[in-house]
Structures are given as structure tokens and as C-alpha cells.
Amino acid sequence: MSRNDASQLDDGETTAESPPDDQANDAPEVGDPPGDPVDADSGVSRRTFLEGIGVASLLGIGTSAASDDSLFQMGGLKPVDDPIGNYPYRDWEDLYREKWDWDSVSRSTHSVNCTGSCSWNVYVKNGQVWREEQSGDYPRFDESLPDPNPRGCQKGACYTDYVNADQRIKHPLKRVGERGEGKWKRISWDEALTEIAEHVVDEVEAGRYDAISGFTPIPAMSPVSFASGSRLVNLLGGVSHSFYDWYSDLPPGQPITWGTQTDNAESADWYNADYIIAWGSNINVTRIPDAKYFLESGYNGTKRVGVFTDYSQTAIHTDEWLSPDSGTDTALALGMAQTIVDEGLYDEAHLKEQTDMPLLVRQDTGKFLRASDVPSVNTDADRPEWMLLMLDSNGRIREAPGSLGERDGQKDYSKSIELDFDPQLDGETTVQTQSGRVQVRTVWAELRDELANWDPEMVHEETTVGKETYQRIAREFAEADKAKIIQGKGVNDWYHNDLGNRALQLLVTLTGNLGEQGTGLDHYVGQEKIWTFHGWKTLSFPTGKVRGVPTTLWTYYHAGILDNTDPDTAAKIRESIDKGWMPVYPEERDNGSRPDPTTMFVWRGNYFNQAKGNVAVEEQLWPKLDLVVDINFRMDSTAMYSDIVLPTASHYEKHDLSMTDMHTYVHPFTPAVEPLGESKTDWQIFRELAQKIQEVATERGVEPISDRKFDREIDLQSVYDDYVRDWETGEEGALAEDRAACEYILEHSEESNPADSDEQITFADTVEQPQRLLEAGDHWTSDIEDGEAYAPWKDFVQDKNPWPTVTGRQQYYIDHDWFLELGEELPTHKEGPENTGGDYPMEYNTPHGRWAIHSTWRDSEKLLRLQRGEPLLYLHPEDAEERGIEDGDSVEVFNDLAEVELQAKIYPSSQRGTARMYFAWERFQFDSDSNFNSLVPMYMKPTQLVQYPEDSGEHLHFFPNYWGPTGVNSDVRVDVRKAGGGDE
């Protein structure tokens, strides 16, 4: 049976209700009572047998005590040698058996942004994917930790349904109606690729190559598929979009304070902690494969505290639950920090060596005191303006080792932060500077003043959390041997998310809970980091010259939102762009003009559906794009609003790799079946598009074009040759196939092929069994050690290397002009913007849910059955009663931007005044032409647009998914009413 011709079982297959004809020998004889079959050997009918059992019961003959003969002496019962073999109507059992019968098994996984990276076995029968099953062969590396096997969730367990689903796109499609109208014409691959190629050649030849962009998220979930389009866009001189900041998954407080994108312990390390606070991380919903470590840690004596606004699915499994008001997590964290500091529960040695707390701050400017400020300091630093100063215990000014002034760039492990003197933590003095005598204080003194604002009365008033409760939690956290915070998206979705991140990080810093197993702040939101970094990077961006763009800013700018922004914020955005701190493409031309973007490729993502400011994206940005190409295995919202849709292979039809920072393994995708219909893998699609572009350019005689920004030429007549060439070895045609690209990543990555070792992980190794990575490369902060779970920050805490910040330490004081101007040089709590979306009484949140990974599985029939089958709005009972709303009513949630109709669900576990809709419902799943993001405006925070230092940016500089403005999903106001104005 061909999988292209049939997607379900034949109608004639047998069932328990309709036995096949070949069971005639088991049928009752003529004259027997209907429905009372007689066993062919014993001559005993089922009714007679049951009557006999009943008599035996009445006579008190227990089956456990009665002899074999006692039943048969009752008459009519005869022994049966093979009762199972002679039982009638048994062919139905073959259906069950056939479920566990297969022709082949392939190892694969799922390319979704969930951080799971779970290995699955995919079973094939008669050319059809029959089912999937979690593999159970992750190798154990520490017998004292819970078994890592198996990993998976209910979404992965029904991906088979997608393989032959009605949503599958089987052929190239061209739009013939309006965008979003759903009118398509089937075209050939040659027609599709030729039309796209001719458009691309036109754009590049006209110098508009930077008007071509590609959006695809999360390389770790399938790096070859990520690289497929990124590689071509890079060769064309086009623009690669960020994604981690766009989804508001990036915690900006981490690059601000620690100078890194993020680094986390693998989830197995949770078991090593004595104390865990799950803060805004609904582990039992969004981290299902890893939840076992959180749950089992309780059996290991770990105390688990939950901080959630609602009584969530994770809160019910914690020992204590704190419920601060929405958007007040920062105030709660600062209150806990104030308790720790005020009661002397901090780790003084850690603060002196590992943080900026002893550094001196000028009281006249708010800037760090630098060696260049003080004539009496004779420094050997190459950049004395970035050589920062401390006071030793005798009151003498000393240079802070590891400062940026003596380092060669952001990351320089040739220096050390180890101290040969005892610095003052709480110091204050007057210093003779180049401009006169200036009073200076330590950062610690400044921090204590800030924390004094967050006394118990203030914190309780702001958060409603009990004073004694949060103070006790703070003490317990500080006094635990190994304490850890697991932070989730619940902290990231707010406008002031950077302040929230910094405040939570402060708790682990104050208590010295960094740099060893069982400690740290683990931030798991999005599968953001890829282990095999170098191989992925050079595969994705072979020229080494990348036009990366922060997607939030790109969207904000081209959707016309900047023109409607408050003047102060708009001025900051323009200043950041003008100074080159944040790029926007297309670039400004010599005459001062800036073209509109013209071309967008989307693959492995659902940009249109997930876009904040969704109304502006549709009305302002989308009309500027002459060509939107979506590469997709299913018809989602972005595909609906595209011009050409190309069918790509499903997750069970291709070669690729999978990894995550939740564990230290790499494992593969392998094709269980051939791609459905005319679909091709992402790598094949972009490879063939490159080939078509080269053909068109050659026919036209298009000459190489000098890149305006980089020292390179864009040569369309060799773009296919360049695409399939191994740029590391120079071998021509080496990367023509997907599997070769997988091998390339593994071969060219330190994590899988260490330079100082004979060990190497090959693709074949991963097919045999998930492989634990051999080393941690340069973009990780600890080594992978045999026999222990990965835990970050050891490079700094144990090895004394400088942190990649201006100070060379964990940096809580940021003396950038914008931070000082906005009063955010230290972590503090601020209210969010007022009346975003309008002056309405309720907050609107869109958290991650249990039944989908972003929009994948949002249209799954099986999973829709678990959640009422349609979009839901969760309301507190009192909010619903106040509006005359009952469970199951159709309601409208609305603000100044849009109104969305959906079903109300009464949710007693939430706080009053909050309306929540789990995010990522597809636009076509709503009755109105809106979606969950239609209600959400787009706005950006100026502190996330800076470069620091302003002139060189070693600490904070735009790099895709490391530093850039985040999207904001919360801080939105709405109201709710019954649909139709309350009329029945």
C-alpha cells in the first residue's frame, strides 16, 4: 500500500464486532440459542459455563479452594486441554498484535522549539509510519542520578498523525487569491524555483540583496535544516533574522550581568540541589521530559518552592507556593535580596572576588572610577580608561585584575580575576582625580542603598506575598548547601524583563550559588544554544560575513510602529540605529534613503502567526514584501499569508541532528519513509534553489557584485557550487546531501571531534545510540566531565578566568549613560508601561501551554480533544461572574488594537484581573480574522538597544540571539464581554 495513495487502513479489516468468514467452524450450530456459542471441543456453552460458576458460588465452592473435579461433578462441564487456543472470535487479537509488528525501525526526533530533544524510534509497516515510541538507550553517566531514560511527551507520541495529515503540503503551491484567502494553484517544482530564482536575481543585481531576509528559529532542534536556508541567504548577501530575542525567550539580564547569552546546567543537575525555586517555569507543562528530575529531587531531600501567579501544574508539586501579583517578580526578588544582605547571609568571599561589588563608583558622574581618572595610579593596562579600581583593607587604591582595560577583547582567559589583596566591600573615600577631588563608593554600598527601598512593608504592598513567608524562603535559600533557581518565561514576557532577570540572578550571586553542581540560575526558555557550535556556524554562514538583524527591531521599524512610538523612546531607537549599535536592513543608502524589505523566506517557523504587533505586521509590513516564500510541511498561518509555499519533508523523512542545553547528548533524525508527495528536505529545497539561481544568473550573464558592507563579492554564477562546497577543506560538491551536512557539523565541532583526542562522534554513532558529547566548546562556561552532570560557570568561579564583562566579574552596576539616565544602573523594580492596548481593567497574558510546541500540534486532532477543541480564554470565577460569563460561553476579549472571539473557561487557580490565552493558536482557528497576538502591541525597551562600552561594545553588542531588544508578550490591557454584547 503506497503512503501517497492511502493514509488509513482498508475498510475490510476485521474487528471484534464482525468476525471474518473463515471462523465458521467456531460459529454456533443451528438451533443453539442466539448469542450463546458452544465450544467446539467441550460442548459447553458460555451461558452454561457461567451458570455453573454461579451455582458454585451459591454452594460456597471457592475457586481457590475447590478441587478440579468439584466443578465438573455439577454436570455439563468438561476439561479443555487448551482453553486459550479454543476460545472463539480471536482473530481480532491480530489487529492488536499487528500494532507491535513492523517492517523497519528508524531513529528520529522532532524539530520543535521545546528544549526536549528526545530520541524516538519510528516504526514503519507497508511503507507507512505506523507509530513512534520513546527510545530508552541514553547512556547513563552518573549512577547516583535518576535514569535519563526515556524522554518524550504526548506531542511527540502523536507526530505520526502529521506525516499523512490533511494539513500536509504535498506539492508546490502558488497563491492566486489575496494573502490569507486560501486560494492556491498547484505548480511544478521547476515553475516554483524558476519564479523565486528570477526574483532573487533581480533583487541582487539591483543591489537590493539586503532586502532579502530569512527567518528560521532555533538551530539546535535541527541544525542542518536551519543551515539549509541560512547558507543560501548568506551567499546571496541577505539578512538572517534573530529569534531568541524575538520570542522574548532571551533573558537580557544574563548578557548584562554575566556577559553571556545564557548557560545552564543540564536538567539532571537539578537532582544535586538541596533547594530549588521554580520561578515562572511551569516545568510540568513546558519541560515534560525533564520534570522527573524536579519531582524525584524531592525524594532526595530537596525542598522545592514555586513562584507562580497561578496555582499551576508545577505549583501543586512544590513544598511551598508563592503567588506574587503579575509583573512583580522583581520586587519579590529584591525583597529576598534585602533580607539576605540585611541579615548577613551573603557569601562575602564570592562577592569580593567574583563580582563588581568592591569596585569604586564616582559620586559626581555615576561612572566607575578608572585608572585613567587617577594620576597616582600607574597602570600597565593598554586601556587605562577601562582599568577599574578597588580599595584594599588599608584604604589604598588597587587595580581590579581582569578588567577590560588589560584584556584582549571580551573573552580573554590569559588574565585572571584572582586577588592578591583583600578588597573593601563596603568602602567609601575621597580620591584626587584629573578633575579634582571626588567622592567614591563601592558598588556594594550603592546596592545596599537600593535594597533598603525594598523592605518587607514595601515588598508586601507591591507583591501581596506575606512578609514572614518570603523572608523565611530567602533565609532557607541562603542557608542551603546547594541552592538553585529554575527560571522560566513567566519572568521574561514583561517590558522590564531585564530588571527581573538581574534581580533573580542577584539571589544566586549573593549566596555564592554558582560554579558547582546543584547550584545556579538555570534559564530554560527555547532551545537556544547548540552544542556543536563551530560546525553549525560554518555550515550556516560559510562566508563568515553575516548580516544579522534583531527581528524585534526589524519588525518594529518596517511595520511602521516607530512612527507611532512615544517621542523619548523613538529618539532612543533612532539614536541606536544611527550609532550602529543595532542594525536595520536594508541599509541606509548614500543618499540617505532606506529601501523597504522585498523578500522573505520562512522555514521551520511561523513568523506571521507569532508576531507581536500582529495588526501592524499584517497592515504595514506585509504589503512591503513583494515575495514571501514559506517552506513548510503543513499549512500554517504563515503559509496561508505567503505567495509561494514549498512542501518540505516531515521530521520522519530526513537526516538531521538534535541537541539541547537540557542534556549533553546528540542524536539524529533519520528518514523512516520517503518524503510524502513531491515534498523534499529543507537542504534539498535550498540546494535546488541555489542551482536554479546559478542557472538564471549564468543565462543572464550577471557579473559579481561588490558587497557594500563586507570585503567580498556576491557571485550568483557560482552560488550553487559554493553551496555544495566544503569551505573548510575546499572539497567541491562535498555537501550535496543532507547526511553529508550532518557529518560536516560533527566533524568540525570541538564538542563531537575534540582536537586533543582520538575520540570522535560520527553520524552512524548517533544512529546506534544517543551520544554524550565529548567536550564543551568555547561558548560554554564549564567542561563536560565524566561521571557528573554539566553545570556552568566553572571557568570563572573555579578557574578564576575573567567573566566576559567590562569589569571581568559578574556585573550588577552598568554605568552606560542610558542606564544611568533611566535609573537602572542597579537592579530595581519598575511598573510596566501604562495602558498598553488601551485603558482596560484586565491584564492579558499568553503563556506556553501543555498541548502544543508553539503552533506545532495546535491543529492536532488528538490534542485538541484534550482542551475543548478550540481557543480558550481562562478567567477567574469572580471576573467571569462580574461580567455575566459562564464556563463555555463565547466571549470577546478586546482592546484598542483588536477583538478576538473564543470560548471562556473558568479557572479558579488564577489571580483576579488576569485573562490568559495559551499562545500560538493559528489564525484560522478563530472565528474572526485575528489571533492571540492581535491584542498585543509591540514596544521595545531602550536599555536593550545599547552598545557597551559605547565605542567598542566588548560587553554588550548586537549579535543574533545574544543581545538585542526582546519582544514583550505581557504588560497588555484588555477587557472581556460575552460575544454579541451579551445577547443570547
Curated annotation (Swiss-Prot):
Organism expressing this protein natively: Haloferax mediterranei (strain ATCC 33500 / DSM 1411 / JCM 8866 / NBRC 14739 / NCIMB 2177 / R-4) (Halobacterium mediterranei)
UniProt-annotated binding residues for [4Fe-4S] cluster: 110, 114, 118, 153
Source taxonomy: Archaea, Methanobacteriati, Methanobacteriota, Stenosarchaea group, Halobacteria
pH dependence: Optimum pH is 8.2. At 40 degrees Celsius (temperature of natural environment) the optimum pH is 7.9.
Main function: The respiratory membrane-bound nitrate reductase enzyme complex plays a role in generation of metabolic energy by using nitrate as a terminal electron acceptor during anaerobic conditions. The alpha chain is the actual site of nitrate reduction.
Subunit field text: Probable multiprotein complex; a catalytic heterodimer of an alpha and beta chain is proposed to associate with additional subunits involved in membrane attachment and electron transfer.
Any single Gene Ontology cellular-component annotation: plasma membrane
InterPro entries, sorted: Asp_de-COase-like_dom_sf (IPR009010), DMSO_Rdtase_II_Mopterin_su (IPR017840), MopB_CT_Nitrate-R-NarG-like (IPR037943), MoPterin_dinucl-bd_dom (IPR006657), Mopterin_OxRdtase (IPR006656), Mopterin_OxRdtase_4Fe-4S_dom (IPR006963), MopterinOxRdtase_cofactor_BS (IPR027467), Prok_molybdopt-oxidoreductase (IPR050123)
Topological category with respect to the lipid bilayer: Peripheral membrane protein
Gene of this entry: narG
Transmembrane segment boundaries: none
Protein name: Respiratory nitrate reductase subunit alpha
GO biological process, one term: nitrate assimilation
Domain of life (superkingdom): Archaea
Catalysed reaction equations from the record: nitrate + a quinol = a quinone + nitrite + H2O
Modifications made to the protein after synthesis: Exported by the Tat system.
SMART domains, per database record: Molybdop_Fe4S4 (SM00926)
Keywords: 4Fe-4S, Cell membrane, Electron transport, Iron, Iron-sulfur, Membrane, Metal-binding, Molybdenum, Nitrate assimilation, Oxidoreductase, Plasmid, Signal, Transport
